[in-house]
Amino acid sequence: MNMSLPADRDTAKKPSAQKPSAHAQNATAAVDVTALGLTESEYTQICSLLKRSPTKSELAIYSVLWSEHCSYKSSRRHLRQLADLTEVTKKHLLVGIGQNAGVVDIGGGWAAAFKIESHNHPSFIEPFQGAATGIGGIVRDIIAMGAKPVALMDSLRFGAASDPDTQRVADGVVSGISFYGNCLGVPNIGGETAFDPVYQGNPLVNVLCVGVMRRENIRLANASGPGNLVVLFGAPTGRDGIGGASVLASDSFTSDAKANRPAVQIGDPFVEKLLTECCLELYAADLVVAIQDLGAAGISCAASELAHNGRVGIRLDLSAVPLRDTTLAPDEILVSESQERMMAIVHPDNLEAFFEITNRWGISGAVIGEVDNSQYLTVVHEGKTLVRLNPKTLTGPSYNRPVKKPAYLIRRSAANRLPVTNDPHLLREDILQVISCPNLSDKSVITNQYDRYVQGNTALCHPDDAGVIRMYKNTGVALSCDGNSRYSYLDPHAGAQLAVAEAYRNVSVVGATPLAVTNCLNFGNPENPEVMWQFRETCRGLSDACKRLEIPITGGNVSFYNQTDGKDIFPTPVVGILGIVDNLTQTLTSGWNAPDLFIYLLGVTRPEFGGSVWADTMYGHIGGVPPKLDLARESRLSNLLVAGAKKRVFESAHDLSEGGLIQAIVESCLRHGFGADIALDTIRATSLTEALFSESASRVLVSCRSQEDLRDLCRRNSYEYTLIGTTRHTGELTISEIGKFTLNELSDARQKVTRVLFRG
């Protein structure tokens, strides 16, 4: 479902010109609407809109399209601020919020479509299929924009690494992502994986996809042309996924939720691969007037969105729908979420050519309706009219839910009161313990399951800070997705801004100019005023950060009801940023690539441990406030990094975020196997603990050959720099105040947890 933001509508509607049959009308007499996910108040509102009782099929449609997942009824009023654009942020934006994905101009007549979405609840119940179909769904969103999918990323959150069920969920999710993505032939170039007890029983599976196309080939989900035909093509419709949007994605559930397995969709990546190539050929032949993928709510959602966006009517005949299960009732056909299906609007003169292409690719299809001037969605089955309603009524209500600042924020204790030390023996133990914690551990056992180089255009991928895909000539598209739920738990407004800043920085450190943002907002129960306060503050933080950085939000996804057994997850905004690389020969990797390089820390280190990995790992402490962020400095840092890459001032660049300086140093050593000699006394810090583990924002670790060039670049951008060491040939990291670590020792420490968890 698109993150469209329709206006809060007047619920007074004219009665339909043609009512459904009496038989169909009476079908809702004994229906328990609450079992369908509707409230009694919402059912009354539906009756008021229709001026009558809904039919069984109409009620099935409303129950899904008025779900939280589809309607954004709790989030819509807060999301409006994300759509605010200035003349500067409009510069590269071609398609914004409201379509299947955002589209930005990347130069040379090319455009990139990108979006991130969630598949959280299904991935707990059936981890493999839940995650796999999450990949399939986001890929079809990109295809529906007219683009060829060229890269994937994922942001994953699992429960405690020590919990027995985490291995089942994590292993299944990663296997599902790798299976579907690898079979589809789309490279997975990066992302993030985190573990925390707050996600026990409610993992987060957020998937980002980017596709490319010529600017003139952008497709929209706007039906037009009365008399044009509605064609359903792809896999036949089955029973899987019925009620997925309302049963799984729009309600809380208990940790024992196996009964919901039928609501999890089943995917076939080989059909999706054929469907992808088929669509691209249909676009090249200009045979599609409009197109919509089938995801949440299936046929009912796709048809209503096409009609609503195009301000036309659509008449469907369910008798013409190709079925995998012939026992499906009409209302089940309407809301089935069977995968690998698309709905296209086709001119009658082009129908023969359309089916010639689908048949060549082995894709089945059928004409199931046509566009008309009625402004209504009409559905018939075996001659009986089952549905007659205005698609505008399907956008759902807009709630102004109460908000309340959480009580835990009043009781939080400051992290800067935790014990710090300058003792070298204690610090050595701290370093090994922190870098081996689940959230900082080596994730290559995950990413090695993904085909990162299929299609042959991957220039950078994990473990670098951003992935880069080769584009026209020698340019590239850079992608990063980031989030820190501990920061958002402590301060949702600041946490959202820090997520934007980190993704922005990660794109910049590879030498790319950030262009646009997509986001996935994962929250608990919206009926909880404290959760709604978190959500409101997060939206405000996203809006403020993007305006300050002059970068547009192109769309995204909201996932509420991430709550199991009454316990809400931490607020978890995940931000994806797309950037453009002017020259791929100037991209930067995250690790030292030679000995005898000078190592510099850019930025200022402060005693900032609120929400840090160090505080959580060493003391089980999550309190205080997140690191302070100055977005003007973040913008200057980005300009400095991009300029330094173009002028070849840097040999490498690595963002500092979770784990602070020591994590960046260790990863930079292990990236290409070069050690380093580090001295911490040049860093202005109150303790060695602060120098090593502080998570102060807007900092980057760089290496260079010419110190004068680096210092001159920093001075011209008014940015702080500190020489902290040099790289070395031997496989050792020496910190003068602490001692030596072998790279094997560091590598083993970082692999302990994930090797066990993912059967590595």
Curated annotation (Swiss-Prot):
Highest taxon in the source lineage: Bacteria
Residues the record lists as binding Mg(2+) 1: E117, N557
SUPFAM superfamilies xref list: PurM C-terminal domain-like (SSF56042), PurM N-terminal domain-like (SSF55326)
Protein location: Cytoplasm
Active site, per annotation: H69, H119
Description of how the protein assembles with itself and partners: Monomer. Part of the FGAM synthase complex composed of 1 PurL, 1 PurQ and 2 PurS subunits.
Family membership noted in the UniProt record: Belongs to the FGAMS family.
Name used for this protein in its record: Phosphoribosylformylglycinamidine synthase subunit PurL
Source organism per UniProt: Tropheryma whipplei (strain Twist) (Whipple's bacillus)
